[in-house]
Structures are given as C-alpha cells and as structure tokens.
From Swiss-Prot:
Family matches, as NCBIfam families: PRK04306.1 (NF003303)
GO cellular component entries: ribonucleoprotein complex; ribosome
Protein name per its UniProtKB record: Large ribosomal subunit protein eL21
UniProtKB keywords: Ribonucleoprotein, Ribosomal protein
Region (Disordered): 1-27
Origin species: Thermococcus gammatolerans (strain DSM 15229 / JCM 11827 / EJ3)
UniProt GO molecular function: structural constituent of ribosome
Family, as annotated: Belongs to the eukaryotic ribosomal protein eL21 family.
Length: 98
C-alpha cells in the first residue's frame, strides 16, 4: 500500500490551479498594494508565489487587517469560535468592496 500524503498543497488541484492564459506571476501592483489597519480583506491565494501563503483551507475567507510585519500583513480570521492570526503577503489579499 502507498502511504497517503499530508503535504501543504494536497487536495488543491482545482483550488490552486491557474487558467493557462493567467500563468506566471501576477502584475507588480498586486505585490505593492497597501491596506489600512481595520480594513476587511479577502484571502485569494496566488499559487505562483509561495512566500506568505496561508493554508489553502482559508482560501476565500474574509478577515480584518490588524497590522503589518515586514512585507506581510497581520490578518485575523474567525474560524468557528476562535480568532486566528495569519501573516499573509499582500499578493494573496484582495480588498473588500463597499
């Protein structure tokens, strides 16, 4: 029998795959975008950039920016009854509209 893999990217074939026309790195503006403390952001993982990538189970979740650490932002997400803190690179974040 083959032992089951428990890697970081397992079961993410659809979640972390890109359309062929969108291959490669995103535009530079996505790397340089800035967020304010208290701003709501969506976590949309950019699969071609691995630094500051959150766990894929949090792809599509919405959180609040609490601060900044280096290039990354400190984002709090409510998961069930707990508040979890993540350090996420801005390329994996999108601002919430409205």
């Amino acid at each position: 029998m083959v032992k089951k893999a428990h890697s970081f990217r397992r079961k993410t074939r659809g979640k972390l795959s890109k359309h062929p026309r969108r291959r490669g790195l995103p535009p530079l503006t996505r790397f340089l975008q800035e967020f304010e403390v208290g701003q709501k952001v969506h976590i949309v993982i950019e699969p071609s950039y691995h630094r500051g990538m959150p766990d894929p189970r949090f792809h599509g979740r919405t959180g609040t920016v609490v601060g900044k650490r280096g290039d990354a932002y400190i984002v709090e997400i409510k998961d069930g009854g707990k508040v979890k803190t993540f350090f996420i690179h801005p390329v994996h974040l999108r601002p919430q509209k409205g």
